[in-house]
Design a protein with these regions (language model features):
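Aromatic "clamp/platform" in nucleotide-sugar-dependent glycosyltransferases that forms part
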Residues: 321
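Conserved donor-binding/catalytic core segment of Leloir-type glycosyltransferases
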Residues: 52-54, 245-261, 267-271
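Short alpha-helical donor nucleotide-sugar binding micro-motif in glycosyltransferases
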Residues: 308-313
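Nucleotide-sugar donor phosphate/pyrophosphate-binding loop at the beta->alpha transition
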Residues: 158-160, 168-189
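Conserved acidic donor-binding segment of nucleotide-sugar-dependent glycosyltransferases
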Residues: 299, 353-364, 373-378
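N-terminal subdomain of nucleotide-sugar transferases
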Residues: 2-93, 99, 271
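Donor nucleotide-sugar binding/catalytic pocket of nucleotide-sugar-dependent glycosyltransferases
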Residues: 20-30, 185-234
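Short hydrophobic beta-strand element within catalytic cores of glycosyltransferases
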Residues: 338-341
């Protein structure tokens, strides 16, 4: 870990002068680049301390990381107005929006469900530097994460690495066990360079420690408890939409159609159980052939629409046994739904018998048994307990208060920390 106190003391007092020649091979030939750089330099001239979040895990259909970042942006605007916040992510072109989201052109990943891969660490770091950040948070170990480290060195500001995924496990899943160790080595090398490493779960913290990264701070993610609310429940509406009778038991999963989500386990388990169970897939069934007892609904961009579907089902199901955290599980709990998970990964740290049921493994037989065990209990009472737990332990306000304390510690800037209440003198 770097000595961030030394970096803070050496932070630049004036904006870093990033030239267009650092961003394009032939400067002056791209109006989008020039306009975006001017906009970033103008915003960097302000006096407020600036937090810059950057990641490639931000796509039109991406899930937890994107919702975390957008929720943080909204919370900072409401509760830390003296802090400027920019979000630097890949896009189809170059654009700096008034809401503080900066999109930098990057190529789409083949079969990547809309994700884009920036090609140049040096250029990404230059773009982030142009914002003159007080603090940078990197949300991945890829080009943006590496660029964040370069920008931190150039500007002289601390850089936080928030570990939202386990790329070594993903490499093993998609390419075989041979790919795990090389990726793990690069992952550990990068995260060892951050001034502070944050993990959303003990599961990911342990994986980082196994890879050789130390000094990890565990900070769970949160949930928008007003958006994801039991009041959105309308079971009759959903049954009519699905063409099912009142005796149906609706199990919901919402997420990307990614291999690690183990959607096949959910399908096999429901088909083993048979009537009256039905699996409702929101977004996760894209591209799949029709399956008995499985209903695929399209991806929903509006969180309120997702909340309405989840709240209107009877239980939420999640079979990823290597999930780093599982933000969608919290959202289901906030909707007042009991959850069936797997006794492994980050989900097992959120779900217990007080709010749902854990399968012994991500095996269809074990998972089917867990579903049956859940419905042998008082599912509605479990859902009410899930709502209470989500509100009391995982509301975004609590999560971001903790994070901004860390930001204040790293930067020495009081604007990140809640000001003390001034009491009137009688």
């Amino acid at each position: 870990m770097k000595k961030f106190n030394e970096k803070v003391s050496g932070m630049s007092a004036s904006p870093i002068d990033v030239q267009e020649s650092e961003l394009r091979l032939f400067p002056g030939l791209d109006d989008e680049v020039a306009a975006t750089l001017r906009a970033l330099k103008a915003s960097a001239a302000g006096e407020r301390p600036r937090l810059v979040d950057t990641t490639m895990l931000f796509a039109p259909r991406s899930g937890g990381v994107k919702r975390y970042l957008l929720s943080k942006k909204a919370w900072l605007a409401d509760h830390r107005p003296d802090v400027a916040h920019s979000l630097v992510v890949p896009g189809a072109g170059y654009k700096a929006s008034l809401d503080g989201i900066v999109r930098l052109q990057a190529a789409k990943l083949p079969f990547g469900d809309g994700y884009r891969w920036p090609s140049s660490v040096r250029r990404w770091g230059a773009w982030v530097s142009s914002l003159n950040p007080t603090l940078i948070e990197a949300g991945d170990p890829y080009t943006p994460g590496q660029g964040a480290l370069e920008a931190g060195q150039r500007v002289g500001c601390p850089v936080v690495g928030f570990c939202h995924s386990d790329p070594a496990a993903l490499a093993a899943l998609h390419f075989g066990e041979w790919a795990k160790k090389p990726v793990e080595k690069r992952w550990a090398k990068l995260f060892s360079q951050f001034d502070r490493v944050v993990s959303p779960s003990r599961f990911i913290a342990q994986r980082l420690e196994e890879a050789g990264v130390g000094g990890i701070l565990i900070r769970p993610l949160g949930v928008e408890v007003d958006t994801f609310h039991p009041d959105r429940r309308d079971r009759d509406w959903l049954l009519k939409k699905l063409g099912l009778g009142a005796d149906a038991r609706l199990l919901c999963f919402a997420g990307r159609p990614a291999k690690e989500k183990n959607v096949g386990v959910l399908i096999d388990a429901v088909q083993r159980l048979g009537a009256p169970y039905h699996l409702v897939l929101v977004g996760a069934g894209a591209g799949m052939p029709p399956e008995d007892r499985v209903i695929s609904l399209p991806y929903e961009k509006d969180p309120r629409a997702v909340a309405r579907i989840i709240a209107s089902c009877d239980a939420f199901v999640h079979a990823n046994d290597k999930e780093p955290f599982g933000l969608i599980v919290l959202e289901a709990m906030a909707c007042g739904r009991a959850v069936v998970g797997v006794n492994a990964g980050g989900v097992a740290e959120t779900v217990d018998e007080s709010v749902g049921q854990l399968a012994a493994s991500a095996d269809p037989i074990d998972y089917a048994e867990a579903i049956e065990a859940l419905f042998a209990r008082d599912v509605e009472a479990l859902g009410q307990a899930a709502r209470v737990k989500a509100v009391e332990q995982f509301a975004w306000s609590r999560v971001f208060e903790d994070l901004t304390m860390l930001y204040g510690e790293l930067t020495g800037k009081a604007e990140f920390v809640t000001p003390q209440e001034v009491l009137p003198i009688n």
